[in-house]
């Protein structure tokens, strides 16, 4: 191995640039059901992005192998990966009524510490309105095994985000720019 070869973490994935961010709680942590407040985002990955999907599947497998002792717990054997809860989910099956998830997989990633957020040129994004549910970008995520309160599986941690381009906001609210994009200045008094 050469001196310049990078050590890679088999459980870490950088998604492709066409990943869409939904439920983007990346500026302030939110608590769910009184639990630990966390930063989170749902990453919508087109099924056509087979490279990212393959990297996620390999990272889940690596997290399973690395976490076998944790997954075994007090049991006699490690449960098969196929019976465990894993974070890569099919939007067509689990969110059939949400067009944003059609033809896509999704991964919910979260962290207790704030993710770093940069633009396409790797400059920090500090303006909150620049990052919203609906933008497209890459995400740095890591997979790990968990065994807590009788629940076992593989989870996804959120590391960093890189916004690549704007997208139609998700959540039903149009942006002011799109609402007033027409040149139709009808005189409403006539």
Regions found by a protein language model. Give the residues of each.
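Beta-strand elements of well-folded, non-transmembrane domains
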Residues: 45-47, 143-145, 165
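Short intrinsically disordered coil segments
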Residues: 57-62, 122-124, 172-183
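OB-fold/S1-family single-stranded nucleic acid-binding modules
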Residues: 148-168
């Amino acid at each position: 191995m050469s001196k310049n070869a990078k050590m890679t973490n088999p459980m870490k994935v950088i998604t492709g640039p066409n990943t869409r961010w939904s439920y983007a709680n990346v500026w302030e942590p939110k608590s769910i059901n009184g639990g630990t407040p966390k930063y989170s985002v749902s990453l919508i990955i087109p099924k056509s992005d087979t490279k990212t999907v393959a990297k996620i599947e390999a990272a889940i497998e690596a997290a399973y192998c690395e976490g076998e002792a944790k997954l075994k717990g007090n049991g006699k054997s490690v449960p098969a990966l196929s019976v465990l809860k894993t974070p890569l989910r099919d939007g067509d099956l689990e969110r059939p009524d949400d067009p944003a998830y059609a033809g896509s997989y999704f991964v919910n990633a979260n962290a207790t510490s704030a993710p770093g957020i940069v633009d396409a040129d790797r400059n920090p994004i500090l303006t909150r309105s620049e990052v919203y549910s609906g933008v497209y970008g890459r995400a740095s995520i890591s997979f790990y095994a968990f065994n807590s309160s009788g629940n076992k599986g593989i989870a996804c941690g959120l590391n960093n985000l890189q916004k690549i381009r704007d997208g139609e906001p998700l959540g039903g609210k149009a942006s002011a720019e799109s609402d007033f994009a027409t040149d139709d200045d009808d005189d409403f008094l006539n």
